[in-house]
Amino acid sequence: MKISIAQTKYRGLDFDKCLEDFKINYNEALLRGSDVLVFPSMFLDHTKYSELFGRSKYSQNICKCIEFIREQVDDRTLIIFGHSVYKDGKFVDIISVISDHKVILTVSQCNSPGFFTYKENVFAVLNFEDALLFKELIPKFGENLKKAQYLIIPSKSYFTKEKNNLRLKFFERVAVENNLDIVYSNFYGAEDSAVYDGCSFFINSFGKLKQAKGFEFDFISNDSFQDLKFDTCNELFEKIILAISLVLREYVCFSGFSKVHLGLSGGIDSALVACLACFALGAENVVGISMPSKFSSEGSISDAKELSRKLGFKLIEMPIKDLFEASSRSFESHFDVKGVTGENLQARLRGLLLMAYSNSQNSLLLNTGNKSEIAVGYCTLYGDTCGGLALIGDLFKTEVYDLVKYINAKFDQCIIPINIILKEPSAELRFDQKDSDYLPKYEVLDIILNRYLIDNESVDSIYLYFEKSIVDKVLNLYFKNEYKRRQGAPIVKVSKKTFGFELSIPILNNMV
């Protein structure tokens, strides 16, 4: 039996484009003689956008789309796709099976397959919950699964750096243990700051693989298989770059901006963001803005210039010395601007310049904060938290270094200057300042954050590996800075737990 997967683009509210994708791929399936065509879960996710789905216009559009598909599909091919539907006073996600202008089956319950027979083959259809991929035990989907020849999964699965390998390992076991073929269809494209990676696949009952491309359209059939191939470390780095690039291109396109800009400090975070922006949009559409103060080192200023030269983007220098002195004079009769007040004032003056440039040039400001800084609030609200999109906000500081090293190795040259990589991290808001004056070394900080936030490890367990005072300091900073995280730029999701997605706590809590 010939089964095909249409790996279509996520279209959100664009119902016309959804139907256009359907028609193109349905006709392709007919031309190829496909018996079954599987789409991802189509249309907007009602669980995230309940306000829209409370309006009759959107529910009516979905019903019209499903009715259009039913009218189009004749007896030559069977179509399987996921969608939302208004049922019993609420919206639910279901999977529909359509052939010969009739709905043969609908499946709504998560992780409980429905069954039908088509051309003497038994099919199981699964509304799969992505969270199961991160659990160690594979659930039993029922004894009836062993009677099926095919398990069909129309998905809408966000990209995370570990997820493709988890999907393949998970469904390889399901295929082999139940002696059936897996058909897994997924979107590609961006949904706000999250991204669908595609990577749809077939896995046969022998554990062999046929996989679609990542981050682009593909149309594949179950006509040839090879050994399972898991992502290597370098391939994961490449996918992170592709994911961030795809989100940025879509974000710029749909938000109506023509270019992007960022504050360029000469540090590794802004260097990586500039590099990723050039990869995604071309250097001609990227502007770096250097805003040195009297605390900025000569090395940071020259490193920013060297980065601009190597990547080919425009660099503008806007010193903040005069602005800072004028602001300080106007404030000093009312309050003292020394210490942290003066440090934050510098960051906010830089934010002022960056946002003014955005208004003036119709340019999207890219935030340059990393996940480590965001987690512990090592940032200035309305200063370096400004921006429309945070490209590296889901990468811990140590991961930033790893990605930079990969990029330099890939191009066999230091397109991100070696001085930027080797220098001690510093906000340069006072003389001789280092991040380690305030935080543990990033090698320690990131392990603590990973264990607590990502792996759900208990505090007592973490105490076994690090000094209690260090762990307590890190967690206290995390718990008291939710108010900053709530006001930050949307973060491009590349890990299984991301601020603004899975990671959220009450602003007012008694954990400090």
Regions found by a protein language model. Name each.
Residues 1-39:
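N-terminal active-site segment of His-dependent metallophosphoesterases
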Residues 18, 29-52, 80, 101, ...:
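Active-site beta-strand/loop signature of hydrolases that rely on acidic residues for catalysis
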